[in-house]
């Protein structure tokens, strides 16, 4: 029995180490190569293979600065200054969730969201959060802030099977992400908390309020050069 338990533990530890190696090697490759698929994209495709994933990569300099400012105003205003984790944001989210008695705020940074999108899944669990933390730690030490934001903008979800700002700009406005206006950029950034719902409810009050807040603060956010 004891030998069996030891064997199971060794298999478990080996599996964990293999996952870390997979994440590490993926991050090494993606430092210099386009990210053409993520775990979120795969999950969407597996749920309905008849529906194609809409995704087009765009280099950092070819994405409107309006969108870079908008996405950070909406998701992670301290992106330039932290090392993957915004402890003030996490504390604020915990306080709000305690007040409301349910999860109404997440506190995740752009780096944490990207780690989840690339390697994990959306269901909340301590195991997922722990792996997200490890992947975020690795990413922040292997990639520049510019690269993290570039991959995030090209990987984040904007609707059903719709990934990346270029695909979103073409879908919602029929134009490239390079020429997004402030209003358009703020709208796309405002979609992110619940993109599949807002895709069909574009006049939702919460969405419009979030867009106004992003417009108010987007010029004060600092973006990577």
Curated annotation (Swiss-Prot):
GO CC terms of this entry: peptidoglycan-based cell wall; plasma membrane
Pfam assignment, any one: Transgly
Keywords tagged on the record: Cell inner membrane, Cell membrane, Cell shape, Cell wall biogenesis/degradation, Glycosyltransferase, Membrane, Peptidoglycan synthesis, Transferase, Transmembrane, Transmembrane helix
Catalytic activity: [GlcNAc-(1->4)-Mur2Ac(oyl-L-Ala-gamma-D-Glu-L-Lys-D-Ala-D-Ala)](n)-di-trans,octa-cis-undecaprenyl diphosphate + beta-D-GlcNAc-(1->4)-Mur2Ac(oyl-L-Ala-gamma-D-Glu-L-Lys-D-Ala-D-Ala)-di-trans,octa-cis-undecaprenyl diphosphate = [GlcNAc-(1->4)-Mur2Ac(oyl-L-Ala-gamma-D-Glu-L-Lys-D-Ala-D-Ala)](n+1)-di-trans,octa-cis-undecaprenyl diphosphate + di-trans,octa-cis-undecaprenyl diphosphate + H(+)
Pathway(s) served: Cell wall biogenesis; peptidoglycan biosynthesis
Entry's transmembrane regions: 8-28
Its membrane topology: Single-pass membrane protein
EC identifiers of the protein: 2.4.99.28
Keyword Lyase included in the entry's annotation: no
Biological processes per GO annotation: cell wall organization; peptidoglycan biosynthetic process; regulation of cell shape
Subcellular location: Cell inner membrane
GO molecular function annotations of the record: pentosyltransferase activity; peptidoglycan glycosyltransferase activity
PANTHER family tied to this protein: BIOSYNTHETIC PEPTIDOGLYCAN TRANSGLYCOSYLASE, MONOFUNCTIONAL BIOSYNTHETIC PEPTIDOGLYCAN TRANSGLYCOSYLASE
Protein name (database record): Biosynthetic peptidoglycan transglycosylase
Name of the coding gene: mtgA
